[in-house]
């Protein structure tokens, strides 16, 4: 049921407006601080019970210079590029020669279908991509 009047209208005039004892509702001091204040002090048992993973670090953090990040392209996308612009790619024994590095990529991944034979030159090639390229009579050259 929807109230026609706000509850505060009824409560007005009473000392605490429905808040119980006047000592309650006194602000953050009444709660032991705002938010996670006291997490290492008086709220420690609450942290242990309800948020046990709140503090601490887990796992390994590698230095950014050690992480090798290669630009990737899928075999299906590579074929689409070749089919859209066939005159841009050289042909060698009826196979398109695709230098992935010239296209701005380094690694070839195996998502998609391959229907035309290609000679793919790349820094790295995944196993699935290699299988798909060689299944239609293509070759893979790792640089």
From Swiss-Prot:
One of its GO terms (biological process) is translation. One of its GO terms (molecular function) is rRNA binding. GO terms for cellular component: large ribosomal subunit. Residues 29-38 have a biased composition (Gly residues). InterPro entries: Rbsml_uL15_N, Ribosomal_uL15, Ribosomal_uL15/eL18, Ribosomal_uL15/eL18_sf, Ribosomal_uL15_CS. Keywords: Ribonucleoprotein, Ribosomal protein, RNA-binding, rRNA-binding. Gene3D superfamilies: 3.100.10.10, 4.10.990.10. It comes from the Archaea. Residues 1-13 have a biased composition (Basic residues). Transmembrane segments: none annotated. Disulfide bonds: none annotated. Coiled coil: none annotated. Residues 1-39 are annotated as: Disordered. Part of the 50S ribosomal subunit. Binds to the 23S rRNA. Belongs to the universal ribosomal protein uL15 family. This is Large ribosomal subunit protein uL15. It comes from Methanocaldococcus jannaschii (strain ATCC 43067 / DSM 2661 / JAL-1 / JCM 10045 / NBRC 100440).
């Amino acid at each position: 049921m929807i109230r026609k009047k706000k509850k505060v209208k009824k409560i007005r005039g009473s000392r605490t407006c429905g808040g119980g004892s006047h000592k309650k509702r006194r602000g953050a001091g009444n709660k032991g601080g705002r938010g996670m204040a006291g997490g290492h002090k008086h709220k420690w048992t609450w942290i242990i019970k309800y948020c046990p993973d709140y503090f601490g670090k887990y796992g390994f953090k590698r230095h950014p210079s050690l992480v090798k990040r290669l630009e990737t392209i899928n075999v299906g996308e590579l074929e689409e590029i070749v089919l859209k612009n066939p005159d841009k790619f050289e042909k060698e024994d009826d196979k398109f020669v695709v230098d992935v590095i010239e296209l701005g990529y380094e690694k070839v991944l195996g998502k998609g279908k391959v229907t035309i034979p290609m000679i793919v030159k790349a820094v790295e090639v995944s196993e699935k991509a290699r299988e798909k390229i060689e299944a239609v009579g293509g070759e893979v050259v790792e640089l």
